[in-house]
Every structure is written in structure tokens, then in C-alpha cells.
Amino acid sequence: MRPSNPFPRIGAPLKFSRNRLYPIDTRRRRLIAKCMTDHNEARAEVLGHQLLRDWYPVPTLHHRVRIPGRTVLIYERLPVDTDRGLLLDLLNTTDDGDHSTLDAYMRRMTSTYLHVFTETAELSPPSTVVGKLYRDRALPGGRLDHYYAHNDIPLTQAQDRPRLSDLARTGLYVNGRHHQLDWDGTLSWLRGAFDTPVWSAISQGDPTDVNLAVPLAWLDYDTAGRNAIAGEIANFSFYTAVLGGWLVPTLNPQAFIQHPATFDQIPANTPRVSAHPHAGTLHIRFTDRLSQARRLALSRYWALLVSPLAARYFPGGALSEALRPYLAMRIIGVFDLVRLSLEQRLYLLTKLALCMAPDFSPTRFFDLTESSCPTR
């Protein structure tokens, strides 16, 4: 009989982001090593994991090793494999498939969130809230400056007009309705929009379909801590409705190689967009498209989690105003508009116009039923 190999077997690296993940198999454990090039981000991840494990199911962190130029975090490896193991895979179910597993998952996930949020919620000054995805990006030298400080982005194929700077004067039409949209004014407003106290709770902070495992567990902890509740809602909702099913796999297909069913679902989640200038004003028409699985997940999230949170912490129409800056940052602070195709750029611009409208309505924005949404 051949003796078992006493040495661990290290698999080919998986690259979902700029940090590489290496599967490791030993005689007793299935592990995954996360190699992080930023020591500060690694430190934040360790602290976030320590905080989260008291409230949420998370894989065990077994080791932390610091080497020159890298910090390596070694976690328990969850059963993530080809087209299975993530919420993403439940959302990739075809429209004629069975969505009962997704429905049960969403009920358990929202129940966990609701318990933790009501136990840990407090009105917090901005300095105590994780700032990576929102406040830090709005600060001088942050992502808004990096993306837009020197760009006046064209809105048609013609390079002369119209451009973003023209919108303060002309506005634009979205599906036949005129919207005022001052681009520079919006950026200026966002720079100070995260400097006031907010309702916050303990969370992972970046609740996307690739950061939620099946069976239920939370992954990726560098934004874990005390996060704005409105930011949490904006992140999950916009990622589920727009980014996760269409824009992210379109722009970063390498991250989805282990989940190829994602690509089959892109057509079902790709909006239709058309635009033309008329009398100096841009007219954009769009139609949202969303698979049944993603629509179900969004509906359950709002009915089972957002509605009770809104009733408790954002009564009346307060949720709309609380969401507005976080949603605006999700729209223009994830991808640089200048690097997108014209169709992608115009679609996000319509979403920004709807978000910044005086009568902004999450119900209309996410095409929710009235029973799913607590606001007008």
C-alpha cells in the first residue's frame, strides 16, 4: 500500500479579484489561501472576520502569515465548485427552473440580517462607520477624483456635443420625462453626503452574490464592521438588479470562469438602451430586464428585510433620502463611466438621473411591487 502524501497539495490559483486564491488540500482539511498584496487590507479583513464570526456564519480563519510583499490568510474552504456554492449560482437558475431553493435561501439570509441589524443598530458618527465603499471614494483623492477630475465625458458618438457638463443647462429626457441633472453639482454633493450620522449595524459591508455562500455563509471581510444600513441596502439591491447579472460579468468575465452559467444569463439581465439628441437635449429610452431568479431575490430582500428596517429606522419617506447618496455612489463610483461603452454609460446615466430626481422612488427605480417596498 502506498503511503498517503504527507505534504499539502496546492491547486491552481483562482482569480476572482486582484487577490489570488489558492486551494490547498491536506490529509485532514480543505483550505483556501488568500494572498493579499496590501497589508492594511489584510489587517482589516482579519479584524472584520473576528467581528463577524460572533454574528454570522463564516468559514474558520486558520492561519495568518505575513511575508515580504504579501499577507496570506488561510481559511476553511467551503464547497464552492463549478456553478455551485454561491448565491450567484442560485440566481443563475433559468426562468423555467425551480426557484424554491433560492426562496428558502433568501428567507434565511434576510432573517439573519434582520436579527443582527436589530441587535446591533445604532445612530453612528461617520468616523465609526466603514468608509471604503462610500465615504473614502468621495474624499479628495478618492475614486470620484480619480475617475472624473479631468473628464468631461461625451454622451454621443460625436465628440463635439452633448457632454456631461452640458446637462446642467439642458437636462435630459429619460423615457419621455425631462430630468434636471447637474453633473458637477452631483459630484460636489456626494463629497459631503457621507459626513453626517447614520443608522449603522454590524455587517460584512459588501453583500454581493459572490460574497454570499451556499449553504449560507458570508465571505470577504475587508469592509466588515459597522456599516451604514442604507449603504448595505443600496449595495445588495443595485448589485442584484444591475451589476451582478450584466455589467460585472460583461466587463470582468475572468472572475466568473468557475461559474459559466453566469454568461448564459447575461442576455436575460441586459437592459435595452437607445438615445438621440434633439434640439440640443439628449433623449434616452431604456427598458430594464431581469431574470425571474434575480427579481425574486430582490423582491424577497425588500419585503422581508428592507420593509421592517424602514419602518423602524427610516419612517415615512426617510429611506428614499437615506438611500440616495449610497445608490448614486454605486452607480458612478464602481466603474469609471469614461471606460464604458456608450450604451453602458448612458444606462448608468439614466439611473443616476432617476436617483437624483426630487421624487426618487425605490419602488419605481427597482421595479418593485408596492408590497415589497415601504416607500412611495
Task: Tell what function each PLM region has.
Residues M1-A12, R20, N40-E45, R312-R376:
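Regulatory N- and C-terminal appendages and interdomain linkers associated
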Residues G11, S17-V46, L91-D98:
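ATP-binding glycine-rich loop module of kinase domains
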Residues P13-R28, I32, G185-G231:
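Active-site acidic catalytic loop and adjacent metal/ATP-binding pocket
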Residues E45, H49-L52, P59, F236:
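AlphaC helix (C-helix) of the protein kinase catalytic domain N-lobe
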Residues H49, L73-T82:
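Short pocket-lining segment of the protein kinase catalytic domain that shapes the ATP-binding cleft
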Residues R53-P68:
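Conserved HxN/HPN-centered segment at the entrance to the catalytic loop
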Residues L88-S111, E119-S203:
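ATP-dependent phospho-/nucleotidyl transfer catalytic cores
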Residues A230-L309, L327-L342:
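Active-site activation/catalytic loop segments of kinase-like enzymes and analogous catalytic loops
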